[in-house]
Amino acid sequence: MGWMQILKASLDIITSELRQDVKSMGGKIYQIGGAVRDEFLGKVSKDLDLIITGIDIEDLQELLNKHGKVNLVGKSFGVLKFNPTGEKGEPVDIVVPRIEVSTGEGHKDFEVKLGKDITLEEEQLRRDFWMNAIAKDIETGELVDIEGRGQLDIKNKQISVINPKAFEDDPLRMLRAVQFAARFEFKIEEETMKEIKKNAQKIKTVSNERFQEEFRKMFEKSLKPTIGVKLLVETGLMKHILSNGKVNPLMDKLDKNAFPAFLALFGEDSSSEKLQDLMKLSNKDAKIVKAVMDFQKLDVNDLNIVRFLSKMTDKSDIIRNIDALQKAKNQKTLSEQLKSMKSEGKPTNLKELAVSGQDLLDKGLSGRKVGEILDFLLELAVKTGKNDEDFLLERAKSKFSGELWKSILKKQYNIK
């Protein structure tokens, strides 16, 4: 299915009855934002952001309740989540026009006003970039693009801010500009670039969660995320984000499911703890990032691989991210190395060792020594490629031949 068919199928959930009810109340339904922009770019958009003008939010909520399930998730921001009757998918975001009036310094100090008297143009002018402010009447297909600025920017492959104060009001928009530049391989328009440089230090006021979301998009939705990382340096944002953050060409070769590997490259001259603080990473993701960073410093051989993985939880995710980085380097992946070890009869972990902890306990060995002996046997099996119970136990007897082994013999053979 092409993007036009997908777009049409998405709009079909706004039934003719709903459209007629909106029209009878003096309202109009428009698509706005990413879906319209992506239509010009020939890309499939998962977003179906709709805006309904000319109706107060309370009346709109009442109207939508007749056609499905509606939740008011942000009355102060005029956001409704709508599931039409019979539809089981994700709800559609429907908003009413709003304006934001600054009440002080900082992007948190503003008052939101919404209502049927606020026009579509006022809504468009409060958005971040011209390419994201194009609206489309879903009835007629007519485009509403102030002075054609949005289409012009898309044609010229550039990102320009609508209001120079936008970065003061919400500094995250600076990172969004960088993210879009990387994602679409657009340039940032000259005046917009100046405004970002002027306000760069304000990026420190952005919450870690919002920062991570935008940074993740820059990696996952870009063919060349290095475009974005280079722009972080060029705009001056980098020194306020991670002073020693790095641009690494391997970033462009990583699998898009390997965000921790991307972070490991980005922060390779920093620490996983700093990255965790910067991005508010989950403990799991932070451990994966640290593991990838540690593996890059490892003298890779069979024994060191086994030692390395023996300390890890979430091994499958760690291996997947290390694999992604090794593929980017055109190196043999960790998965391939582990497969080779198994084919040579070498255990890659204690579970694969021919002697278990229970085997040692059954022979009368003290529990506190079991771990020490198992570690010795695992290393021995990896070094020699001999993962055989008799061989391993014989070597254990030689290694631990004092009073410790006598206690085993005493129990096994009733020696006094």
Place the predicted regions along the sequence by residue.
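Catalytic cores of the polymerase beta-like nucleotidyltransferase superfamily
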Residues: 1-416
